[in-house]
Amino acid sequence: VNRNELAGLLERAADLIEVLGHGAYRAQAYRRAARSLERYEGDLEELARSNFAGLPGIGPALAPMLREIVETGSFPYLEELEGELPPGIQELFQVQGLGPKRIRLLWEHGIDSLEALLASEGKLRELPGFGAKSEARLLEAARFAQQSRSRFLLAEALVAAQSILLDLEERKLKAALAGSLRRGLETVGGIDLVVLGSPEEVREALGKHVKAQEEGVLRGEVEGIPLRIILAEPPTFGTLLVRATGSQAFVQHLGPLPEGREEEEVFEALRRPWVPPFWREPEHLGLQPPAPLARNQLKGLIHCHSTYSDGTTPLRELALAALQQGYSYMVISDHSQTAAYAGGLSLSDLQRQWREIEALNVELAPFRILKGIESEILPDGSLDYPEEILTRFDVVLGSLHSHLQLPFEEQTERVLKALRNPYLKILAHPTGRLLLRRPGAQADWERLLEEASQQGVVVELNGNPHRLDLDWRWALRFRGALNFSLATDAHSLEGLDDIEWALFYAQKAGLEAGQIANFWPLERWQHP
């Protein structure tokens, strides 16, 4: 496990401790330890060998348990907690708006699963802390969670798939990703593979992951994700890979598929150029694939968070990491003052950060840190600081974090007002969605993106695997009218690698380097 995964396990344990009523102090201790781990930037294995010596919040009671997790990958205490709860309780954590305290309240009133929650319409409003409106919001979130529970984030499914591919590779079995995972849809229903081998060979390689066999197909599961393995013979491996990758509309568009050992042979026989898997969606039919976008040609790191707000990395370390990764400038964008939940910056915080930025710009020249902010778009559409403060930023990003359930017209007017604010440069993660967790704000996005184009506002493609917002389909539709920025939205050094996801979805949207703000020279920000 890495430090963020370890912190996540501690947070999970703290949640279950609260639901079970095993003591608020114990839950708080686990959360303090999780925060401390998130801020730690050193080597986790070395820290474990030292029994977490000197790390705030981790004392002699927790240290041996954490060391065991690092060394073995198992967390027996968490398994014990999970065993004390009805299985359905785990699902309730997927419902937006439900935390441990509310889940405990629901459990005390006999609501111990998603199905039980959905069947409680008219009853929830009678519980302490609930009313008719909160009941309606919770039931809407529960329906969304129910629709999402058979889906998995692309990034998580890809990690699980890579472990299976390694097992097959060790047995010298040729294998390739297929399906929506290979095409790079943001959420997937499972892992599809095409494998050159017999059922016996694959079973021997994958062991318990294979559960069933059909004609030419093995089925199973890896880390809770459904697994489908399509068995191929050498002459038709490429043909099966094209068909299994899809999309169905793309395969139908190709017509009858000839035999081919590799995909390239299939396309050559069809007298068509090979099409990269990310460009095989129905939305791409009839369109030419874009030119590749290279990470090493990016000039600007845009949208990241430091310890001034809710990031875990000090500003100087973040700048040094950006410099080391080849960027020539960085737009720091900590949260604005209204975002108290995320350590939003007060006016005095801004002054402190600006002084540090000015000093670092001298120290690290010609690398430059631009004074940015991720401003809350307030419910009335205004930005989060007075004009005399907004004018002092180099780059103002505006984003939605709250009031995502405003009525359609009201939400549209809210974002329209923000887009017309002369200080707004970037509309960040526009809809505010969290994949499989909550839908984005409902608004007239066609009208809003047209307005962004007219106002010259850059629209963000957020690379956080939980967001991937703006949706690539909207970006594809507006690729001829808008400029875009690629964001890591990094809250840690590891988060800087999420630029890979942003680059991938920029390609899936057919974007060119010239319309992507991260490829722009510094001067374009200073003299728009």
Predicted features, each with a name:
Residues V1-H22:
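Charged, compositionally biased N-terminal leader segments and the immediate start
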Residues N2, H22-Y25, I58, E84, ...:
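Catalytic cores of large soluble enzymes that bind and process phosphate-bearing ligands
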Residues A14, R26-I191, V195-L227, P234-T239, ...:
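Accessory alpha-helical DNA-binding modules that contact the DNA backbone or grooves
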Residues A14-G21, Q146-S150, L400, L404, ...:
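Short amphipathic alpha-helical interaction patches enriched in hydrophobic/aromatic residues
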Residues L177-G179, K371-I373, G463:
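Short loop/edge segments at beta-strand edges and connector loops
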Residues G184-L185, G189-S306, T312-I332, Q337-F367, ...:
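Charged catalytic cores and adjacent phosphate/nucleic-acid-binding surfaces used
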